[in-house]
């Protein structure tokens, strides 16, 4: 007999932890973090960036993850219901915005997972591309075909199956994905570090050039990486927290999840830095030339992953095996995050009164259709990634505002301090949620919009049709907010009618 939604719970702490790590560990750990670390490194090393990155883990990511866990467990509702429960009826639109931002990311994230699946199959069945031209040919031929649509559909279908039975199927999938992913990452790191010259890359990664800390851009990039990397403020942890038992400590799991995520990012960086420095170093390239390769954004910011890594694997002993493991791990990382995004969207529909299977079918169908433009056009993909990636800063601030609306201290005392199974949580969390998170979120938002106006689209920042303009953000956010404000009372009524 199928368990009622209100009664579903994770079967164990381990099952919950694996699922929470599945949220945090995604493709960004493996392809974005090494590139951003290299981009923000100085002539001597990238260690200063790592320092700033760790600081923001404790100032942004962990406080927001704790807030999400509290909201989800207390309300037993998705993002809309949680905001209604904690902040009040008038703030249903805020929960809707948090949910829709992550749903919009789902549309094109599924396309990314499709890329990873395709490359895994290619690495498994075809010779590795040995030159830059061959690597570009592999990428361009794929993008020019109908295959991106096919693999986008495969990703959505697998994601739908993974959440079909609710938390019971989610935890079963993550119990396989996450340990396998961690094993793949560790094996890949070991192989990379045994290559000649690999430790030059490791030395660069961890050597601090302290003067870099005076560069505001480094701090903003470190904060952005935390905001995008851990999943804090997306509403994903809130959604999984619906299914946790009270004895599962919120604080301890928030720390383990966030720190575990950053460890995976560091392992991925060790693998990438070690491989790139070894192979290109043996070809006689200087450190500066090697770093130029690592900083290359490429198509849809994936140049290092899909253009350079395959040809580097082709030049190393046992490279085919490592390439297969690399793209299998990338696929697993993508899937573990994708299913949490699909569960968030489905859970909101369930809270509005839909049956789970109907909600999942709606989410999968709409997500596939809405992802088609990103699958067919990389400019549209880049636009959606920019617009909704920046909107995550607003989502993080909204989560903090919901907690403040209820009462930060009251929530900490009721939901954490009265739980003997959890770690203690001092007033640093209160201060972070009230002051630090809003300030950081607004600062990031202003910075990214200023980059749009001065760097990405300086000549047409006012043009809503320009992929990276300020106006394209305002128009798309404004359209979503207008609809949500119009539907606010209806959403609140539906949530409360289902609760009653």
Where on the chain are the PLM-derived regions?
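Membrane-interface "cap" regions at the ends of multi-pass membrane proteins
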Residues: 1-31, 64-69, 73, 77-83, ...
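Membrane-embedded translocation segments of transport machinery
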Residues: 2-14, 171-339, 347-354, 358-362, ...
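Inter-helical loop and helix-membrane interface segments of multi-pass membrane transporters/permeases
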Residues: 4-7, 35-44, 79-97, 110-167, ...
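Transmembrane helix-boundary motif of multi-pass solute transporters/channels
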Residues: 12-54, 238, 244, 253-255, ...
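Transmembrane helix-loop boundary segments of multi-pass membrane transporters
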Residues: 32-54, 70-72, 76, 86-87, ...
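Membrane-water interface regions at transmembrane-helix termini and the short interhelical loops
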Residues: 36, 40-43, 86, 90-106, ...
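Hydrophobic alpha-helical segments and their helix-loop junctions in multi-pass secondary transporters
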Residues: 64, 106-131, 182-208, 274-279, ...
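C-terminal membrane-solvent junction of multi-pass transporters and transport-like membrane proteins
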Residues: 88, 94, 99, 144-145, ...
């Amino acid at each position: 007999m199928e368990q009622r939604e209100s009664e579903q719970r994770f079967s164990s702490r381990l099952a919950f932890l694996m699922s929470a790590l599945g949220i945090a560990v995604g493709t960004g750990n493996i392809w974005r973090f090494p590139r951003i670390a290299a981009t923000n490194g100085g002539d001597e090393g990238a260690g200063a960036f790592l320092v700033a990155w760790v600081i923001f883990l404790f100032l942004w990511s962990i406080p927001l993850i704790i807030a999400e866990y509290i909201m989800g467990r207390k309300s037993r509702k998705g993002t809309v219901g949680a905001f209604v429960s904690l902040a009040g009826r008038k703030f249903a639109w805020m929960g809707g915005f948090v949910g829709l931002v992550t749903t919009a990311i789902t549309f094109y994230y599924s396309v990314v997972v499709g890329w990873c699946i395709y490359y895994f199959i290619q690495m498994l069945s075809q010779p590795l591309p040995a030159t830059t031209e061959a690597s570009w040919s592999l990428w361009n031929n794929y993008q020019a075909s109908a295959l991106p649509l096919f693999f986008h559909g495969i990703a959505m279908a697998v994601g739908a199956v993974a959440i079909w039975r609710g938390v019971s199927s989610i935890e079963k999938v993550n119990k396989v994905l996450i340990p396998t992913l961690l094993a793949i990452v560790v094996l890949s790191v070991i192989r990379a570090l045994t290559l000649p010259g690999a430790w030059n890359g490791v030395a660069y990664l961890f050597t601090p050039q302290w003067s870099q800390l005076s560069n505001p851009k480094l701090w903003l990039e470190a904060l952005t990486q935390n905001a995008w990397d851990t999943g804090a403020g997306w509403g994903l942890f809130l959604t999984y927290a619906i299914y946790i038992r009270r004895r599962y400590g919120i604080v301890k799991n928030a720390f383990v999840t966030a720190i575990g995520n950053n460890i995976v990012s560091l392992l991925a960086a060790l693998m990438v830095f070690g491989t790139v420095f070894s192979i290109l170093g043996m070809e006689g390239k200087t450190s500066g030339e090697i770093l130029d390769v690592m900083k290359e954004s490429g198509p849809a910011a994936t140049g290092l992953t899909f253009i350079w890594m395959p040809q580097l694997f082709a030049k190393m002993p046992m490279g085919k095996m490592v390439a297969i493991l690399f793209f299998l791990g990338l696929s697993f990382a993508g899937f573990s995050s994708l299913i949490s995004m699909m569960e968030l969207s489905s859970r909101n529909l369930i809270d509005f009164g839909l049956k789970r299977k109907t909600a999942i079918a709606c989410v999968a169908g709409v997500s596939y259709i809405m992802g088609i433009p990103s699958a067919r056009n990389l400019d549209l993909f880049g636009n959606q990634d920019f617009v909704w990636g920046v909107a995550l800063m607003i989502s993080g601030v909204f989560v903090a505002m919901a907690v403040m609306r209820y009462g930060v201290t009251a929530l900490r005392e009721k939901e954490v301090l009265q739980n003997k199974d959890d770690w203690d949580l001092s007033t640093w969390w209160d201060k972070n949620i009230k002051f630090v998170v809003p300030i950081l979120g607004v600062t990031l938002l202003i910075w990214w919009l200023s980059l749009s106006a001065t760097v990405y689209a300086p000549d047409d920042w006012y043009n809503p049709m320009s992929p990276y303009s300020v106006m394209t953000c305002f128009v798309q956010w404004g359209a979503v907010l207008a609809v949500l404000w119009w539907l606010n009372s209806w959403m609140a009524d539906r949530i409360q009618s289902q609760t009653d």
